[in-house]
Amino acid sequence: MPSKVPAAPRDSGKVQHCDVFVLGSGLAGSVSAAILARNGAKVVLADAAAHPRFAVGESMTPQLVEWLHILADRYDVPEIKSLLSVQATTRDIGPHFGTKQHFGFMLHRPDQEPDPREATQLVLPKLLSQAAHLFRQDSDSYMFHVAARYGCTTRQNWRAADLAFDDDGVTVTGQNGEAFRAKFLIDASGFRSLLAEKFQLRETPARFNHHSRSLFTHYVGIKPFDDVSRHPAELRPPVPWHNGTMHHLIDRGWFWIIPFDNYKDSRNPLCSVGLTFDERVYPKPADLTPEEEFNRYLDMFPAVKRQFAGAHRVREWVSTDRLQYSSTHSIGHRWCLMSHAAGFIDPLYSRGLSNTFEVVNALSYRILDALKDDDFAVERFEYVDELERGLLHFNDMLVNSSFISFSHFKLWNAVFRVWGALITPGVMRLTRARLRFQLDNKNPQHFIDLENAPHTGLWWPESDKLKALLEATAETCEKYEVGELDGDEAANIVFRLLQDSDIVNPTFGWKDPRKRFIAPTTMTMIKFMHWATRQGPPEMRELGDENLRGLIRATAKGKKLL
């Protein structure tokens, strides 16, 4: 493991000392820095750019919401809860955030109008919270300033030139000659990681099965899809497409439409727009600008194009090569390659921030304990490497299966349900840990216990059944991809897997292929809890029963959990 290098020369008159140096002040770096500083560490937070600034990762998920709760409660950083919902972001940060009431998916074929029967939607239960479309320049700037208020030394427009590690720590030297001496380094800088470059950590090619590249920017004037779809009212979903994250699915790719103007109190006219597609099927042209290329694909899909009539781009395009990258490892002597600095799959399903904050949770207490014990043995941090690897592995499996299925609606309808079936128990196990923490005098052991699971990185890592369901789905989709199965055969296999699995919740409609719009009501949630506590398999009954009893106890004690 390339983790130690000769000691760097020190100049005690110039080198500034800290406990932790954080490279990158996006949400990953700023939240980590705020947590560490709030809990007594001396932290430097530096970035080559400055706030406010554009960032991708704008769509929230139920699991992300729960991780935000956990980080705020466990590490006593209440400002993190300002990201919990569109109401909270609007109140605490500003009126620039959209609402996310659903994940919406519509299948498109070239030069054809989309069939309204080839659409799926998952509505997020109102019982939880009204998630936000995060306007990242505001959310990231907010958390950066939270970190500063907790005492972090900050540097903007500050580019690291050298990282020199030895047994006792790391010396970080900027291009301006300024030097810092730290006991531990977190690299949260993303793909262009100086740490990954220094230790040659990138795997070539990336180890993942999935392939995609992306074009993205911000627009004003994007029309709601509801206004241009031309679909009859009786075939439309229960929640307007414009009220959530819209995914326009094409063969081996998808357009995203993430509006920031869809919340009643928003004053933000912008809409995030992107196209992510398999670079092997859609090679990057050398003779087109990103805008010309994007418009070429818009011309192929008339209903999507109608959303752009009269709209105007307000940012330069970002045009990537292959998005997927991976690292040999993400933990070494006195350093961590965090989340998007370690690897990336695809923005589909908006897993990025949820995965990031799961890593922040696992890393932060280990650093605080290491500072207290003055013991930074790599072994103390090995779980973080295992976690980052597992999160990427299972996400790769799901996203690759999904891209394969986009060419055949029946198969997509099946894969959509596998994804959906993973969400609720994944959130429930986190809620259970938070309930235990609150009811047991804020004992952090209940969060540490989450790590004792056989399938690290899976949404419900204790579940052999969900792991088997996901693996069988991936195997089936791969057989369809190479022609061993046709689309109907592959879809039928996945639907049988769903039907036969006792761990898949039947009350939402995941087992019914005719129910394309999943919109849990309060009554649906009551029926679900009855199934989870009385009719589900033992592991689900245990999870459901403890959540229900914990919520009742917490409510009786006046603790607000949701």
Summary of predicted features, one role per range:
Residues 37-58:
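Glycine-rich FAD pyrophosphate-binding loop
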Residues 317-338, 343-347:
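FAD-binding beta-loop-beta segment adjacent to the flavin cofactor pocket
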Residues 91-190, 194-195:
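Feature captures the FAD/FMN-dependent oxidoreductase FAD-binding
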Residues 146-303, 360:
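Predominantly flavin-linked oxidoreductase catalytic cores and closely associated redox partners
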Residues 68, 351-371:
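An active-site-proximal "capping" alpha-helix that borders the catalytic cofactor pocket
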Residues 11-28:
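Beta1/beta-strand and adjacent pyrophosphate-binding region of the FAD-binding site
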Residues 53-112:
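N-terminal FAD cofactor-binding segment of flavoenzymes
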Residues 362-415:
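Active-site-proximal substrate-binding core of FAD-dependent oxidoreductases
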